[in-house]
Amino acid sequence: MEQHIRIPEKEVPVVKETDVLVIGGGVAGIAAAVAAARQGVKVTLIEKSIVLGGLATSGHVCVYLPIDDGNGNKVYGGLAEDLLHVCIRYSQDNLPEVWRSKPDTAPADSERYMTNFNIPAAVLSLDEFTAQEGVDVVFDSVFSEPIMEGNTVKGIIVESKSGRTAYMAKMFIDASGDADLVYRAGADTETLKTIVSHWFHELDFDIMKRGIEEGDMLRAVPMRWLGLVPSGGAGDEKEDLTCDGTTTEGVNEYIRLSRGLALDFLKKNRRDDFAMISLPFTPQFRMTRRLVGTDELKYDDEYHIDSSIGCVISSLDKPATVYEFPYEGLITDKLSNVFAAGRMVSASGRGWAIMRFIPACVLTGEAAGTAAAIAVKDGCTVQQVDIRKLQKILEDNGVKLHRTKAMEGNKPKIWKLEKPDAQPGAPIINKYCVHVDTEGYRMAGDKH
């Protein structure tokens, strides 16, 4: 029988009142906070760790995936493009020269508009970027629960070294990655157990030597991926090798399994010319819980959406299918002043997987932050935001709202689960990332 205790009521100090409050300092939260601040409202960002960037930094997924469609057409502009360049401002990179000046198009056979980046350099650059944009960032502070008045969030309770405190705001953006605010505030959500995945950086003497000789430090210190991926076959015992990132038990199981993979790999590679030099310090869940919004993105959506806040792509496909994401995928009818941003926006099936990529997370963050600022200025709810006003601001800032004729021919790739032909341990990504699938299974086409 589950036990409960009653906690005595006590007064909680209000330490901040602001216009827009963002929960989560990943790429979506950064974009949301900066976009809102650029519209002239006061913004506070609450981050549970001590670095910005989320999975891109503390999760070691330091690959800014393509923002072009693979046919030479830039799909993501605005902050999605800006943040790519912020991440490499002080870092080595492998950005193709053809894209360095931020053109809208390039030759169709050009390399993809993407780059790897150095994590510490990106962290420091993101600190500088948010400070320059006037965002008040509060580190080492964990969102606990919302303060509700009907269907309106009036504030949030935060736990930190100062104890339990309250932050009050007019508009809230949930960029937690796990829909923590929208779930605890009573909105509908969907959860998904996802595969165990583990990225880390390593030093291998031969690889390092080649990288140094070529003047390529990113190649000298490559990433490695280990994972447990279910085959999808009937009766496969690997089907239970997934974890729920919304529970304490699920998170701890994920950590146990992922570090177990790393330990097994380390035991098999104990030699003088090899060293594991960094481990992620946040669980590397792909998807956990997402908003069930007023509308959603589906994988087979290939049509014009009047309320589009920007285009998104299945980044690893070449050519990549281009989709339009609806404003209604950021909101729910059940909450009057809360937006979702990042991997937890309203998208189903493979559409949800598309929305977890860094560029898509930044896009939804920029849209949510801009919309929140509009709502503050106009004194309206999230449902009453003037979509045309939002779209004009986004478009003026470089966001591609709708597919162009050149993008319409890109067709979806058929995704399936399969056993790879290569043996476990074979490098199958590129010279910057090597992939080892301990169990010998992978998702075809999903090499990230």
Enumerate the predicted regions with their spans.
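Flavin (FAD/FMN)-binding glycine-rich loop and adjacent Rossmann-like elements that form
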Residues: 4, 55-57, 79, 83, ...
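Membrane-embedded transmembrane-helix bundle of lipid-linked glycan/lipid transferases
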Residues: 8, 21-23, 32
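Conserved N-terminal/central alpha/beta ligand/cofactor-binding core
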Residues: 9, 15-17, 41-42, 48-145, ...
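Beta1/beta-strand and adjacent pyrophosphate-binding region of the FAD-binding site
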Residues: 12-26
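N-terminal Rossmann-fold NAD(P) dinucleotide-binding loop
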Residues: 29
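Aromatic pocket-lining residues of Rossmann-like dinucleotide-binding sites
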Residues: 36
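Short, hydrophobic/aromatic-rich segments at coil-to-beta transitions
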Residues: 150-156
